[in-house]
Regions:
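PRPP-associated nucleotide enzymes
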Residues: 1-312
Length: 312
């Protein structure tokens, strides 16, 4: 069996465009999979070609969370029952990752539950990108290949050739990620210290560092309602920043996010295509991570190291 015959790539409904680009990069066809939806809201998964003895790669971001997660679980179960040799879940955006610990009494740890569900369903490996918390890798008993969007975002930032560049973190929790970018680009780091009134609502924010006459790039792992990142951009502009941009791995962009970004001080906000973005906001740009995932899949198939893919 040749290398191309040894593996197959399939996609759920949430990330089909990215899966097609991954297959184009790999030089293979996207596998035939039918998802039948019923009037009561249930759905069934069926592989339309033999996958017996093959290494299967299932591409599916779990956003919006519940239906796409259930769809992925059924894809895994069907592959296991169809005698696939290995089942590799390729989850560019891992939903529920913000529920990685008990931050108050009597709450669930959603990320651990999702990890357990995927494991019980039958995955042999997880390939994902920029988990909200790195320690989620430890929730799995199977190998986890954790990729970083810096592999495509850093080259983009370098192409802008911005002088007086400053990297910013929108909160203290993201300082490690932002500091990695700052070190690679050889520029200063500034932080924002925020206080939340409740979930998705920022009550106050202060800048720690100098942004006057600087070109600021805010780095984050995801943008949800865009309240934090747009508030940070507006405050930095008021503090004298020349320009403010933002880069984030995952384009959740729910609720009022698009309107907030459009009306903010941001020059642009750059995401990967881990989540498709359909709203039209002139300030939103997406960079594909298809080649990065394709190369990872190729290396997994050939039992090669993937560490050389990481810029930082």
């Amino acid at each position: 069996m040749s290398e191309k015959d040894s593996y197959m790539v399939f996609s759920g409904t949430s990330t089909r465009s990215l899966a097609e680009k991954i297959c184009q990069s790999l030089g293979c066809e996207l596998g035939q999979l039918v998802i039948t939806k019923f009037s009561d809201g249930e759905f069934a998964v069926s592989y339309e070609e033999s996958i017996r003895g093959r290494d299967i790669f299932l591409v599916q971001s779990t956003f919006p969370n519940s239906d796409n997660l259930m769809e992925l679980l059924l894809m895994i179960d069907a592959a296991k029952r169809a005698s696939a040799r290995t089942i590799n879940a390729v989850i560019p955006y891992f939903g529920w990752a913000r529920q990685d610990r008990k931050d108050k009494p009597r709450v669930s740890i959603g990320a651990k539950l999702v990890a357990d569900l995927l494991s019980v369903a039958g995955i042999d490996r997880l390939i994902t990108m920029d988990l909200h918390a790195d320690q989620i890798q430890g929730f799995f008993d199977v190998p986890v290949d954790h990729l970083y969007a810096s592999g495509v975002i850093l080259p983009y930032l370098q192409s802008l050739k911005l002088d007086d560049l400053v990297i910013a973190s929108p909160d203290v929790g993201g300082s490690k990620r932002a500091n990695t970018y700052a070190k690679y680009l050889g520029c200063p780091l500034v932080l924002c210290n925020k206080t939340r009134a409740r979930a998705n609502v920022v009550s106050s924010m202060q800048i720690i560092g100098d942004v006057k006459d600087k070109n600021v790039v805010i780095i984050d792992d995801m943008v949800d309602t865009a309240g934090t990142i747009t508030k940070a951009a507006d405050i930095m502009k008021e503090a004298g920043a020349k320009t403010v941009r933002a880069c984030a791995s995952h384009c959740v962009m729910s609720g009022p996010a698009s309107e907030r970004v459009q009306n903010s001080s941001l020059e642009e906000i750059v995401f990967t295509d881990s989540i498709p973005y359909s709203n039209r906001c002139a300030k939103v740009k997406q960079i594909s991570v298809a080649d990065m995932f394709a190369e990872t899949i190729r290396r997994v198939i050939n039992n090669e190291s993937i560490s050389s893919q990481y810029l930082v």
